[in-house]
Design a protein with these regions (language model features):
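Local sequence-structure signature of Cys/Sec-based thiol-disulfide redox active-site neighborhoods
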Residues: 1-26
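Short active-site oxyanion
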Residues: 4-6, 29-31, 60-62
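Structured beta->alpha junctions
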Residues: 11, 34-37, 60
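Generic recognition of short, well-ordered alpha-helical segments
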Residues: 17-18, 43, 69
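Thiol-based oxidoreductase modules, predominantly thioredoxin-like and allied folds used
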Residues: 28-41, 51-52
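Thiol/disulfide oxidoreductase modules built on the thioredoxin-like
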Residues: 44-53, 64-65
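Non-catalytic, surface beta->alpha helical segment in thiol-disulfide oxidoreductase systems
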Residues: 58-82
Length: 82
């Protein structure tokens, strides 16, 4: 079973917009959680060990910031899981 990616963002964060656009461009479905406006999302983000955005989480894998190679590696490995 593949876990749907969760993207933690904040309004006005240029890096968040880049990751959102990257996921959309590659047709990867994801749930966006705005840690700046949603206290529950902020708590979830804190539980990952960071307050920084964007943070893409898929299962136990994480990518902090906009790093296309790391995003490709993470999303590709998760799509190949049974």
């Amino acid at each position: 079973m593949v876990t749907e990616p969760i993207l933690y963002t904040q309004a006005g964060c240029a890096e968040s917009a880049k990751v959102r656009a990257w996921l959309t461009d590659y047709g990867i479905a994801f749930t966006e959680r705005d840690a700046g406006r949603d206290p529950e999302a902020a708590q979830e983000l804190a539980e990952t060990g960071t307050f920084a955005t964007p943070l893409l989480v898929i299962g136990h894998g994480k990518v902090l910031g906009f790093h296309p190679k790391a995003l490709t590696d993470l999303t590709s490995s998760k799509q190949q899981e049974p």
